[in-house]
Swiss-Prot record:
GO terms for cellular component: cytosolic small ribosomal subunit. One of its GO terms (molecular function) is structural constituent of ribosome. This is Small ribosomal subunit protein uS15. Part of the 30S ribosomal subunit. Forms a bridge to the 50S subunit in the 70S ribosome, contacting the 23S rRNA. Keywords: Ribonucleoprotein, Ribosomal protein, RNA-binding, rRNA-binding. One of the primary rRNA binding proteins, it binds directly to 16S rRNA where it helps nucleate assembly of the platform of the 30S subunit by binding and bridging several RNA helices of the 16S rRNA. Forms an intersubunit bridge (bridge B4) with the 23S rRNA of the 50S subunit in the ribosome. Belongs to the universal ribosomal protein uS15 family. CDD domains: Ribosomal_S15p_S13e (cd00353). It comes from the Bacteria. Disulfide bonds: none annotated. It comes from Pectobacterium carotovorum subsp. carotovorum (strain PC1). The keyword Ligase does not apply. GO terms for biological process: translation. InterPro entries: Ribosomal_uS15, Ribosomal_uS15_bac-type, uS15_NS1_RNA-bd_sf.
Length: 89
């Protein structure tokens, strides 16, 4: 199941640069992180759902690519985003 419209709007408001900024790298990474976290809960109940697991791996790969891009372009925004999302230890 995907995120609700309200959850997406809240993420866009929290991480976006403007009110309708849904395309910035930070927003895309935050949305992917929310979907990944949701799917991790799904897999605790449905261990053999390999079809969804493939989608999860695709999302993780896409998030990694976006984070690599952001790290290349603006390290300060990258570190800020990592801290806000709690992705690195």
């Amino acid at each position: 199941m995907s995120l609700s419209v309200e959850a997406k709007a809240k993420i866009v408001a929290d991480f976006g640069r403007g009110t309708n900024d849904s395309g910035s790298t930070e927003v895309q990474v935050a949305l992917l992180t929310a979907q990944i976290n949701h799917l991790q809960g799904h897999f605790s109940e449905h261990k053999k759902d390999h079809h969804s697991r493939r989608g999860l791996l695709r999302m993780v790969s896409q998030r990694r690519k976006l984070l690599d891009y952001l790290k290349r372009k603006d390290v300060a925004r990258y570190t800020s985003l990592i801290e806000r999302l709690g992705l690195r230890r």
